[in-house]
């Protein structure tokens, strides 16, 4: 009976396993045991290991490719909605904060805010993250005072006229 169980475990290992870069590991991965524990505890993986890819040591998590056998991260894992993140530990690869989440345009995440709907350039980066008021619709994104009311203004006609 033990022999049959061992064979079924080997068949599981040789089954289809999907490799994905860890979503919770930051920095170089040099501690495979720590990577393995984080993949299992935080990401619901079957296994984790450090590998060098593209000249970087990264933590990779291994999941069962069958979605029915891979329920996802365990409850209470960092990044699970409605649960507080675990406090960061010490050492390389520890996240200084929880995994990044999508932020609205004008926030401080990502490569910068999206351009305004009316055109023009996005607000300068590195500000307070507030964003401010959008430019007037149809504007060119430039500043300056509006033309005086009435009169021809002596300039080119407005767009669409």
Curated annotation (Swiss-Prot):
SUPFAM superfamilies: Scorpion toxin-like. This is Anther-specific protein SF18. Residues 70-88, 96-105, 113-125 have a biased composition (Pro residues). Residues 70-161 are annotated as: Disordered. Belongs to the DEFL family. Residues 1-8 form the signal peptide. Anther-specific cell wall protein which could contribute to the cell wall architecture of epidermal anther cells via intermolecular disulfide bridges. It comes from the Eukaryota. Residues 126-155 have a biased composition (Gly residues). Disulfide bonds join 18-65, 29-50, 35-59, 39-61. It holds the Pfam family Gamma-thionin. Epidermal anther cells. GO terms for cellular component: extracellular region. Keywords: Cell wall, Cell wall biogenesis/degradation, Disulfide bond, Secreted, Signal. Residues 16-65 are annotated as: Defensin-like domain. InterPro entries: Defensin_plant, Scorpion_toxin-like, Scorpion_toxin-like_sf. The keyword Transmembrane does not apply. It is found in: Secreted, Cell wall. One of its GO terms (biological process) is defense response. Its main location: secreted. The keyword Disulfide bond applies.
């Amino acid at each position: 009976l033990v022999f049959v169980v061992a064979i079924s475990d080997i068949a599981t290992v040789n089954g289809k396993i999907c490799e994905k870069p860890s979503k919770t590991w930051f920095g170089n991965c040099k501690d495979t045991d720590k990577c393995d524990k984080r993949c299992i505890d935080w990401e619901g993986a079957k296994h984790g290991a450090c590998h060098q890819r593209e000249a970087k040591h990264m933590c990779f998590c291994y999941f069962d490719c069958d979605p029915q056998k891979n329920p996802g991260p365990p409850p209470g894992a960092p990044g699970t909605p409605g649960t507080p993140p675990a406090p960061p530990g010490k050492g390389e690869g520890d996240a200084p904060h929880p995994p990044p989440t999508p932020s609205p345009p004008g926030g401080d995440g990502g490569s910068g805010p999206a351009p305004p709907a009316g055109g023009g350039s996005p607000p300068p980066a590195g500000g307070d993250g507030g964003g401010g008021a959008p430019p007037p619709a149809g504007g060119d994104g430039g500043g300056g005072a509006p033309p005086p009311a009435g009169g021809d203004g002596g300039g080119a006609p407005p767009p669409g006229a």
